A protein has these predicted regions:
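Cytosolic-side transmembrane-helix boundaries in multi-pass membrane proteins
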Residues: 1-27, 32, 36-37, 261, ...
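Alpha-helical transmembrane segments of multi-pass membrane proteins, especially transporters
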Residues: 16-20, 48, 83, 87, ...
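Hydrophobic core segments of alpha-helical transmembrane domains in multi-pass membrane transport
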Residues: 19-36, 94-98, 119, 123-125, ...
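Interfacial/capping segments of alpha-helical transmembrane domains
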Residues: 30-66, 193-204
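Single transmembrane alpha-helix segments in multi-pass membrane proteins
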Residues: 34-40, 56-129, 144-148, 152-167, ...
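Transmembrane helix-bundle core of multi-pass membrane transporters
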Residues: 177-249
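Helix-loop-helix "hairpin" substructures at the membrane interface of multi-pass membrane proteins
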Residues: 225-303, 329-330
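Transmembrane alpha-helical segments in multi-pass inner-membrane proteins
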Residues: 285-289, 294-365
Length: 438
């Protein structure tokens, strides 16, 4: 049994999973410490309130509110779980966007800009095509594909600059992020799409249901009543599986990873490294654009364009999602859901305790920073793994009896035939220098 556990621990996949879990646990523990410190500094938060805050951090998704006596109640909260899945959609997609680029040796910090371009095109198509003349389902599909295409084209720009001019993709992505932010703001400012103005806001609110376009629920609203969840989460999961198959089971995925491992060696092996760099960033951009389309085409969300003079946080949150998943597309599904769970936990902290909504951002920030330590934890676990393997080998060697190490020779010496050695070939004598030649 001990040997089986040692073999399981020695696997590289086990080490990666443990590193991510330890990073998450450390983040939650530090987040709890932050909650306690804030509670001690805030007079209106009691000791009982601090304890409730810590409990909500670890199990807030299962909180159902308070009973008549004011105590927290626990159980399966379908609304919370549904909203968590809804918020996980864009996080899964931006996490995939960052992970695909990482696999090719690139750092796609341009996911926010690609997400914004997907927002611009998907909303423009959903609100611009009249639903009176075109079926709503066709409009939704065109808007979704348009968002993916816009993200792909925006992501290809840093890829081209990297492949052709060797410009660092991080600098190029930062540049395109702010161009996208201002472009989206300007385009919606001059647009004539159908909108509604709320008296408390100075900008315009856009919602795809104004044109009758919304992602179908497929019965998920009955499974999670009162929540915003729709079929978009299924699309996100399917896309994650498709990305996994492409990256792990196809020649194209192997070429992308080969370029990420060593671009120059891949080129010498005949792999078109420049083409793969551009395609990798384009695919990453398409995934980020798809995340924006799934979120804004849901029919539940209202796009307020004035807020996008800043970059959307969901694009940057894709980075810790990918890091915690160790760039594995399947693991991105779970880390994206985990990050969405933290959002729901923050709402529970705000609604059920005296903490304000900003405490959640602090906790998420702590976990984001600690996600970068997952690689360090992997290195520490690797050292531990080598030690366990050495100890296991010593134990295995010690269990071998001494007489079994050198088996006795049962054949009598006189029965061993003589094996004649081949005679060395005769080398003709060379005549002395200056002598006569034969």
């Amino acid at each position: 049994m001990k040997q089986k556990l040692t073999d399981l621990y020695a696997k590289n996949g086990t080490k990666k999973v443990l590193a991510s879990l330890l990073s998450i646990l450390a983040g939650l523990l530090l987040g709890s410490i932050v909650v306690i410190i804030v509670g001690l500094a805030e007079q209106k938060i009691t000791t009982a309130g601090m304890w409730e805050g810590v409990r909500l951090i670890f199990a807030g998704i299962l909180s159902t509110g308070r009973d008549a006596a004011g105590a927290l109640t626990w159980g399966f909260n379908a609304q919370n779980v549904g909203n968590m899945l809804f918020r996980a959609m864009p996080l899964i997609m931006t996490g995939l966007s960052v992970a695909v680029a990482f696999k090719t040796g690139l750092f796609n910090i341009g996911a926010p800009g690609q997400y914004l371009m997907g927002t611009l095109v998907s909303l423009s198509v959903a609100l611009g095509i009249p639903s009176e003349s075109v079926p709503v389902g066709i409009i939704w599909l065109l808007a979704f594909l348009g968002g993916m295409l816009a993200g792909a084209l925006w992501g290809a720009i840093p890829g081209l600059l990297k492949a052709l001019l060797n410009i660092n993709e991080v600098l190029a992505c930062i540049m395109t992020n702010w161009i996208a932010a201002n472009l989206v703001t300007w385009m919606f400012d001059i647009s004539s799409f159908k909108n509604v103005t709320e008296g408390t806001k100075s900008g315009y609110i856009y919602k795809t249901t104004f044109n009758g376009v919304a992602t179908p629920k497929l019965g998920l609203d009955q499974l999670f009543p009162g929540s915003q969840v729709n079929a978009g989460i299924l699309v996100a999961i399917i896309l994650a599986i498709v990305v996994y198959i492409i990256m792990e089971k196809t020649v194209f995925g192997y070429e992308l990873k080969a370029c990420g491992a060593n671009r120059h060696a891949a080129r010498y092996a005949g792999i078109p490294d420049k083409r793969n760099i551009v395609l990798s960033m384009a695919i990453a951009g398409a995934l980020a654009g798809a995340g924006a389309a799934l979120y804004w085409l849901s029919g539940n969300t209202e796009f307020y364009w004035n807020t996008y003079q800043a970059l959307p946080g969901v694009g940057f949150n894709g980075i810790p999602v990918a890091l915690l998943a160790v760039n594995n597309p399947i693991a991105v599904i779970f880390t994206g859901i985990f990050m969405a769970m933290l959002d729901i936990v923050g709402l529970q902290l705000t609604n059920l305790t005296a903490y304000n909504e900003y405490i959640t951002d602090v906790i998420i920030s702590v976990i984001v920073y600690l996600s970068a330590f997952s690689l360090l934890i992997q290195m520490m676990l690797t050292g531990r793994k080598k030690k366990l393997v050495v100890e296991a080998n010593k134990t295995t060697t010690a269990d071998i009896p001494a007489e079994a190490e050198t088996p006795p020779l049962d054949v009598p010496p006189e029965d061993i035939p003589d094996i004649p050695m081949e005679e060395a070939p005769q080398v003709p004598e060379q005549p002395e220098e200056g002598g006569e030649q034969a």
